[in-house]
Design a protein with these regions (language model features):
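Conserved non-catalytic scaffold segment of RNase H-like nuclease domains
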Residues: 1-90, 98, 144, 154
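Acidic, Mg2+-coordinating catalytic module of metal-dependent nucleases/exonucleases
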Residues: 84-91, 95-96, 100-101, 132-181
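Short coil/loop linkers at secondary-structure junctions
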Residues: 44, 107-108, 129, 149
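A short alpha->loop->secondary-structure connector
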Residues: 102-113
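Short alpha-helix plus adjacent loop in nuclease-associated cores
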Residues: 116-133
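Alpha-helix N-cap/helix-start motif at coil-to-helix transitions, marked by capping-box chemistry
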Residues: 63, 113, 133-137
Length: 181
């Protein structure tokens, strides 16, 4: 599958404020696209196929988008192995991103290293450690548990923001535990 939306957040640091950016890609193939799934995310097949003016303005070729993403991500001045990817079920995202860079013959400029943090696995570990494994760990479940609002579930932009808030609450929990030691 080709990603249609890629949304990233750069966490705030001493040198830069927090920033989020979302890119829209025209898929390489339209074979496996389900129209019903597009509607959930607010996309239209005719836009993806560039049959509309709006679609031609919004959805760009992966080769163009990758350069924009690389430039935006590397503004932090870090090397790829110093940067980490945080996500919910992050291996899915990391594999899809790496495959996208591979299809564009650009793996050598992939802006992330191997460091990943997964909100789903963090939550599973917390529950497992307390002997209370939940039946599931969907982002929807975690936003509810932590009181996080996801204004438009299943859109990359909103899911990324919600995941970040869940991650910050998980991180705050660990900070409190570690401060007691």
């Amino acid at each position: 599958h080709s990603p249609i939306e890629i949304s990233l957040i750069r966490f705030a640091s001493e040198n830069s404020p927090e920033e989020q950016k979302t890119w829209f890609l025209q898929p390489a193939s339209f074979e496996n696209i389900e129209v019903a799934a597009l509607k959930v995310n607010g996309h239209k097949l005719e836009d993806l196929k560039h049959q509309t003016e709006e679609g031609r303005k919004k959805y760009h070729k992966p080769s163009e988008v990758l350069v924009e993403i690389e430039n935006w991500v590397t503004e932090d001045g870090l090397l790829g192995d110093q940067r980490y990817l945080v996500g919910h079920n992050v291996n899915f995202d990391a594999n899809m991103l790496q495959y996208l860079w591979h299809t564009q013959e650009s793996l050598d400029s992939y802006p992330f290293g191997r460091r990943v943090l997964d909100t789903m696995m963090i939550e599973f570990f917390l529950d497992w450690s307390a002997d209370k494994v939940a039946p599931g760990y969907r982002l929807q479940d975690l936003t509810k548990k932590y009181g996080v609002t996801n204004s438009k579930a299943h859109s990359a932009d909103a899911d990324t923001r919600a995941m970040k808030e869940v991650f910050e609450k998980q991180r705050d929990f660990f900070k409190k535990v570690l401060a007691k030691q």
